[in-house]
Structures are given as structure tokens and as C-alpha cells.
UniProtKB/Swiss-Prot annotation:
Pathway: Cell wall biogenesis; peptidoglycan biosynthesis. GO terms for molecular function: glutamate racemase activity. GO terms for biological process: cell wall organization; peptidoglycan biosynthetic process; regulation of cell shape. Coiled coil: none annotated. HAMAP family: Glu_racemase. The keyword Ubl conjugation does not apply. Keywords: Cell shape, Cell wall biogenesis/degradation, Isomerase, Peptidoglycan synthesis. Its EC number is 5.1.1.3. This is Glutamate racemase. It comes from Haemophilus influenzae (strain 86-028NP).
Amino acid sequence: MDKKEKRPTVLFFDSGVGGFSVYREAKKLLPNWHYLYCFDNAGFPYSEREEESIIHRTLAACQLINQRYPLDAIVIACNTASTVVLPPLRAAFEIPIIGTVPAIKPASEITKTKHIGLLATKGTVKRHYIDELIDKFAQDCIVERLGTTKLVEIAEQKIRGHSVDLISLKDELSSWAGMADLDTLVLGCTHFPLIKDEIQLCLPQVKYFMDPSAAIAKRIKYLLDDKNLQVQNEKYNQMFCTAHFPEESQFKKALHLWGFESLEVIKID
């Protein structure tokens, strides 16, 4: 590819590395675009934070990165953050802001038993907008909700090279293990597609796993493809975090596997 070709710059933002599940679908669909990824590990997990804190930290990180790399779009690759930060971000930026919404509508269309599980963070499952999605698209279904921080931590450990603790995973999902007609699972946190295979081992009755990542990638393409983008970008893909962490050196060695050249710590407090 000619380096002088205009490439959109897209920032993916999450409190952890769960947003990799969205980024990898975008990279698969649009391999030559310029990607930045920021995970706010100093504020992790967002499911334990107040809404005002999530808004402040997300805005601060996005504005700081935008000053250095003029952005063409921001993807909030975090369901918990997407429930609160989209309006303030859209007020602060004149570029597309793309959120992550649990795939309840497609789940209601594909389920055969009309019994759906929504697996998300504690912050997401209690949001009013989840009630609205269910009322609008899944009134004829039984929708079980399970809010968990443990699965987020398990996914974080997996992406950092650790083995998945299946015993802990099974224990966390045990309340659903006996639901024989639970045939559809909405992965309502971007971390969970990263441990989908392990979840399936624990819930073998589930036939359909609903992950919005591919749809988000198509949305990015729709909003930015063939647009008159003014920046001629020759930058390499870069990752940011907000605090140093124990596995940092090992993590950096694996960056190229995800298509990134470097990891930089930024301060947003």
C-alpha cells in the first residue's frame, strides 16, 4: 500500500483489553487503516466506577490522544462505558463516536427456545437502557441477566498470556448450568468473546453466541469509507495504557501479534 494514501485514524477505547475483540474485526475488514488502542488500566474495571468518573476518564484520554493523532472516529469498545459516555463524547468531538450495544435484538431473532442469557458486567446489566432494549426487541423472550467482574478479569489474564481458570469460570456461570433450554447467549461485554470457547465448555446447551464486534466493524467502514479525509497518515498502529503493570514487558513483546508497534503510558488523572 502506498504510504501517501489517506488512511482513517480510528481510536478504540476500553478500560481493559476486551476491546481487542472489536479491534480485531475492524482490522480483519479494514487491514490498512491506522489504529490506536487505549486501555485505561488505572481505572479498571469500569463496572466498579461511578458514571462521572467513567465520563471524565474517557473524555480525558480521548482528548489527549486526539491532540497528538487527529482522529477520524472513536470506538468505545466497552459496553459499560457506552451506557454513559456517548452523549458527552459526541458533544466534545465532531467525528463519529461509535458505541457498543449488547446484541439483544439479533438474539431475540435467532433463539429457538425464547430463552436468552445476557452476560455482561454488573454496571451494564443494571442500566435502564438494557430494560429498554429488552422491552423493544425481546418482550416474547425470557432474558436472564448475569453481571460479573470475574469473567472480565479472566479474559484480561488470558490476553496477557495466562491460562484460563475453568474452575472459577464454571463457578461464576453455575446458576445457568442447569437451564437446559437456554440456547442463546448475548456477550454483553467486549471481553467475553475472548473467552467464548471456554464459556461454551461451561454452558454446552448454548447454541448461539451473539457478539456485536463484526457489526461494529461494518459500521466503522460505512461511516468512514470513501469519505474526504484530510489527514495523510503515515503513522504506525500504537497502543496506550494509563498505568504500568506487572506483565508490561511480556505484553509489549506480543504487540506485533495484534498489529501494534508500541505501547505508551499516558496519564489522565
